[in-house]
């Protein structure tokens, strides 16, 4: 299935989602980023967004999730399963330190993916489709790496196997789902009149008034990971009574856990949006400079040839005039 056809389906399905850290969170990150793109950067990435999406970067932000979902992409989801491990990394339980040589073997983790696709996006040896996919993956993975549990513990698979109850609901859930969906759902319902656009405007204002976004480096992927790991150990895995969560017991989380963590979600969405914009703007500049570098030697040669022709022509005219004067 082509990207254009798949995204025509997904974009029109997107209105069915009410809330969710998945599609809504990624959409917000992309939307925040696009609001800060340089004109030239926006024009460049628009070349890779299917025409029916009208340049909407947020509409492609969940593509890497959709292509490995058999319900959304039933015909060839299995062709993309190789990309699953690129969405996250895991560290030893309560080790609280990411070590790439231990936790990202052969670059098969989210840090390796961020490095790879930022390079492929501006690699002249990659064709249009490869660069388009690189953009889609990059937009998504910048969002993923700012979700703390995408840098969670190996023993419970990033919170998937930590089971319990959230806000006294009768059906059990897992910690990953609490972070993917539940906290953001309640946050938007309570504080933004169930309106995602109001939430976006709030995040946008937050983004321009946060000290922690000053002097950001556009591709400090290790720093982004270290931040998520720190939040996992200091905040995400602690229940309402600051007792560690694990797979040995069911959790019961409520108001205290919610109030402690919704500001962190706001912060991570804002950081992801800002950093994605910085990354794309810088890659656009790097791409522009790369376009001229391979032609520089040729340009110098041509310039030298033209200069030599000019010198010989001027010399020829001078000699002709001098000979003509001698004859007279």
Label each residue range with its predicted role.
Residues 2-17:
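Cleavable N-terminal signal peptides of Sec/SRP-targeted secreted and luminal proteins
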Residues 8-10, 22, 302:
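Residue-level recognition of hydrophobic positions within alpha-helical transmembrane segments
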């Amino acid at each position: 299935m082509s990207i254009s056809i798949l995204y025509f389906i997904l974009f029109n399905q997107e209105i069915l989602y009410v809330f969710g850290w998945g599609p809504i969170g990624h959409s917000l990150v992309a939307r925040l980023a696009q609001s800060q793109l340089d004109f030239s950067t926006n024009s460049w990435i628009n070349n890779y967004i299917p025409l029916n999406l009208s340049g909407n970067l947020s509409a492609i932000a969940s593509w890497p999730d959709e292509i490995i979902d058999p319900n959304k992409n039933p015909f060839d989801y299995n062709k993309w399963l190789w990309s699953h491990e690129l969405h996250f990394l895991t560290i030893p339980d309560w080790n609280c330190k990411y070590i790439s040589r231990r936790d990202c073997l052969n670059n098969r983790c989210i840090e390796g993916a961020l490095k790879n696709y930022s390079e492929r996006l501006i690699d002249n040896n990659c064709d249009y489709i490869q660069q388009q996919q690189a953009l889609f993956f990059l937009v998504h993975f910048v969002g993923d790496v700012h979700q703390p549990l995408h840098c969670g513990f190996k023993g419970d698979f990033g919170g998937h196997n930590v089971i319990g109850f959230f806000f006294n609901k009768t059906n059990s859930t897992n910690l990953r789902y609490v972070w993917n969906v539940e906290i953001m759902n309640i946050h938007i319902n309570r504080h933004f009149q169930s309106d995602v656009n109001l939430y976006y405007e709030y995040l946008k204002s937050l983004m321009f008034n946060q000290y922690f976004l000053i002097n950001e480096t556009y591709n400090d992927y290790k720093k982004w990971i270290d931040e998520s790991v720190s939040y996992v150990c200091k905040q995400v895995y602690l229940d309402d009574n600051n007792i560690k969560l694990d797979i040995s017991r069911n959790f019961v989380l409520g108001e205290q856990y919610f109030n402690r963590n919704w500001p962190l979600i706001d912060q991570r969405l804002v950081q992801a949006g800002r950093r994605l914009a910085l990354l794309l703007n810088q890659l656009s500049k790097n791409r522009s400079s790369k376009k001229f570098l391979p032609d520089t030697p040729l340009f110098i040669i041509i310039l030298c040839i033209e200069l030599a022709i000019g010198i010989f022509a001027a010399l020829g005219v001078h000699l002709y005039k001098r000979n003509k004067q001698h004859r007279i």
